[in-house]
Curated annotation (Swiss-Prot):
Lineage, uppermost ranks: Eukaryota, Fungi, Dikarya, Ascomycota, Saccharomycotina
Top-rank lineage group of the source organism: Eukaryota
Enzyme class: oxidoreductase
PROSITE patterns in alphabetical order: CYTOCHROME_P450 (PS00086)
Binding positions (heme): C451
Protein name: Cytochrome P450 52B1
Organism: Candida tropicalis
UniProt keyword terms in alphabetical order: Heme, Iron, Metal-binding, Monooxygenase, Oxidoreductase
Function recorded in the entry: Together with an NADPH cytochrome P450 the enzyme system catalyzes the terminal hydroxylation as the first step in the assimilation of alkanes and fatty acids.
Molecular function via GO: heme binding; iron ion binding; oxidoreductase activity, acting on paired donors, with incorporation or reduction of molecular oxygen, reduced flavin or flavoprotein as one donor, and incorporation of one atom of oxygen
SUPFAM superfamilies listed in its UniProt record: Cytochrome P450 (SSF48264)
Swiss-Prot/TrEMBL induction comment: By various alkanes.
Length: 506
């Protein structure tokens, strides 16, 4: 058989392989030239840091899953910025499941992602579809005009009047105090704060006093935690979020929504409550109970977990450094004494400078949402990350995702917080350099999507911290506790191994 015949036979038998190779090569060439054209058009440069994690980015996906399971994904995300070819450039490009993903901790890039005229350049891409089975059409899943309209309604519900009555927190603190005093030895305070956070949230949202003896309460809390596990997995899978949709997830969503429907109905049947009730206020704008439920679910996620985790990480740090608690108690004693909570008000709590410094420092080291993602609605650029020194703009194609890791920004010694950025030091917040940080400090996001409940969370946490300092002389960390703590990254971040401590009464 001649060479010509052999070649013809090979082509005939393996035409599909040749066709795919030809198609793949041609598409790569076209993509290269199209990218070059776009870079010239948008005056962008190639990214200086590019991490190639193998074919299709499959290795990167499995590595992220492994760290997620081991509760080391946050530390892994931070380390990636330190292990790029040029660590002084705070942006890199990698490939995940076939898609090029931009990761950044650069405040200038983050500012573009968050502060462009709303919905102009970036949105949340597949995030809405990924979490919608759990959160419905809540504020966290809406985009565009629907989001604007809903946020406009909700914004008015977080004014000064709705959070002014701080003494409403006192019965809940007494419940927490009773639980703490009933413990023998070391116990996980994070679990107690999660219970407290849910009870506070339900009273604020539904006007109901709900405790563990309410029917299906335990089922709800377990299902809610499971929903958050699934939501995190679905977000990680990106375009393939639909793969994480088994019967456990569907069942958990049903339990959560049924419990919330029950609370909405009970709340609407009792409108005589003279306190501020979120559902009652929302019902003035709509009679759609499903819509009310969906907003309530988003608010539960934001309020219950954010406050609980802020308090848990605060106690974790105070239990390791007793002088901070002593300094806190001195400030409280000098202003109001250690015996009575009667003088605590919205305004007086905001005047506790060291209380605010402790909470700011906790939020710096342990932000409630340590990472986030945006997707380009059109081809555009980020201001930094390209060129020979990383100071040139880089291209962001339509549909391309950009992840920003706020905790990496907070812990970077170069960007703002100095060589001791990994050290819990509340006194840093009295330095003049801590003013007007902009996107260098993002405990509650920034721009149009800044957390509506920011003041509520801070006042609630301030009240609890002051009352704990008035009640307990010391808090002691378990001698076997690991530090820094492993961080479980769901939608919010919590201590993966809990916060085991022991309280000592005054």
């Amino acid at each position: 058989m001649s060479l010509t015949e052999t070649t013809a036979t090979f082509i005939y038998n393996y035409w599909y392989i040749i066709f795919h190779l030809y198609f793949y090569t041609t598409s790569k060439i076209i993509k290269y030239h199209h990218t070059t054209y776009l870079m010239i058009k948008f005056k962008a440069s190639p990214p200086l840091n590019y991490i190639n994690k193998g074919f299709f980015g499959i290795q990167a996906t499995f590595t992220e899953l492994k760290h997620l399971i081991c509760h080391t994904s946050i530390d892994y995300a931070i380390d990636q910025f330190n292990n790029v070819p040029f660590p002084h450039v705070h942006t890199f490009v990698t490939k995940v499941l076939g898609n090029e993903l931009i990761m950044t901790k650069d405040p200038e890039n983050i500012k573009v992602l968050l502060r462009f005229p709303v919905f102009d350049k970036f949105d949340y891409g597949t995030r809405s579809s990924a979490v919608q089975p759990s959160l419905g059409m809540g504020i966290f899943t809406l985009e565009g005009e629907n989001w604007k309209a809903t946020r406009s309604v909700l914004r008015n519900m977080f004014d000064r009047k709705s959070i002014d009555k701080v003494h409403d927190f006192e019965p809940h603190f007494k419940t927490l105090q009773k639980r703490i005093d009933g413990k023998v030895g070391y116990f996980d305070i994070q679990q107690e704060f999660l219970k407290l956070g849910l009870e506070l949230s339900i009273e604020f949202i539904f006007g109901q006093v709900v405790s563990e003896d309410v029917p299906h309460y335990d089922d709800f809390t377990q299902a809610w935690d499971r929903c958050q596990d699934y939501m995190m997995l679905r977000l990680l899978l990106g375009d393939f979020y639909w793969m994480a949709n088994d019967w456990r997830y569907k069942q958990s969503n049903q339990i959560v929504q049924a419990f919330c429907d029950y609370l909405v109905q009970k709340s609407l049947e009792n409108t005589c409550n003279d306190k501020f009730v979120f559902v009652h206020q929302l019902a003035k704008h709509t009679t759609n109970k499903t819509f009310i439920r969906d907003q309530a679910l988003s608010l539960i996620m934001a309020s219950r977990d954010t406050t609980a985790e802020l308090m848990a990480f605060t106690i974790l740090e105070l239990s390791r450094k007793s002088h901070h608690l002593g300094k806190l108690r001195e400030e409280i004693d000098a202003n109001f004494g250690l015996e009575s909570p009667d003088l605590l008000t919205f305004d007086s709590l905001r005047k506790f400078k060291y209380v605010q410094a402790i909470l700011n420092e906790t939020l710096r080291m342990y932000p409630g949402v340590p990472r986030n993602m945006k997707t380009a609605k059109c081809t555009t650029t980020l201001p930094k990350g390209g060129g020979p020194d990383g100071q040139d703009p880089i291209l962001v194609k339509k549909g391309q995702s950009v992840g920003f890791i706020s905790i990496a920004t907070h812990l970077d010694p170069v960007l703002n917080f100095g060589s001791d950025a990994h050290v819990f030091r509340p006194d840093r917040w009295f330095d003049s350099s801590m003013k007007n940080l902009g996107c260098k400090y993002l405990p509650f996001n920034a721009g149009p999507r800044t957390c509506l409940g920011q003041q509520y969370t801070l006042i609630e946490a301030s009240y609890l911290l002051v009352r704990l300092a008035q009640t307990y002389e010391t808090v002691e960390s378990h001698p076997d506790s690991v530090y820094p703590p492993r961080k479980k990254a769901l939608i919010n971040m919590c201590a993966a191994d809990g916060v085991d401590v022991k309280f000592h009464r005054l």
